[in-house]
Design a protein with these regions (language model features):
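Acidic, glycine-rich flexible loop segments
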Residues: 120-121
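Charge-rich, low-complexity amphipathic helices
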Residues: 1, 23, 72-73, 105
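N-terminal pre-ligand scaffold of iron-sulfur
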Residues: 25-99, 112-116, 127-144
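Short, flexible active-site loop motifs that bind/organize anionic cofactors or intermediates
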Residues: 13, 37-40, 107
Length: 144
């Protein structure tokens, strides 16, 4: 079978466009991409709530702020507070009185687990945007 040169050009251009489109920064769940690279010493008195497992704090950063949760002595989770349900509304989630659930009852009406940001109450279909974390025993780094 003989393929005409213009068809080969179209195939090549299509492949190039798909490759380039695949290289742009990802916006998970429609939450705006915000560069995050934060480091702090968890032993600082300002972060006393992070010194034991199940502790959490709010910090500035990300799209609508960040929740930092200590799962174990060596493992942390950092999640954006921007609700992924109708992200254009800019709803911000809060840790509720149970200390287990993150929710926004006024704006997005969704609920998430504090341990991993997964959805526990609709209408959100995707969990909270998570950031990478590394911990060396004293300094926690949160980044994307």
């Amino acid at each position: 079978m003989f393929i005409r040169p213009p068809v080969l050009v179209l195939i090549g251009l299509s492949a190039a466009i798909l490759f380039i489109a695949g290289c742009k920064k990802e916006q998970r769940s429609g939450v705006p991409y915000t560069q995050v690279d934060i480091q702090f010493n968890v032993n600082n008195p300002a972060y006393v709530d992070l010194q034991v497992p199940s502790g959490w704090i709010y910090i500035t950063g990300g799209s609508r702020g960040i929740i930092v949760y200590r799962k174990t002595m060596d493992e942390f989770v950092a999640m954006d507070r921007h609700c992924p349900y109708r992200p254009e509304d800019g709803c911000q989630v809060f840790v509720d009185d149970t200390q287990v659930t993150v929710r926004d009852t006024i704006c997005c009406g969704s609920a998430f687990l504090i341990v991993d940001g997964s959805v526990t109450g609709q209408p959100a279909a995707t969990g909270l945007q998570q950031y990478n974390t590394t911990f060396n025993g004293t300094t926690l780094r949160i980044y994307n």
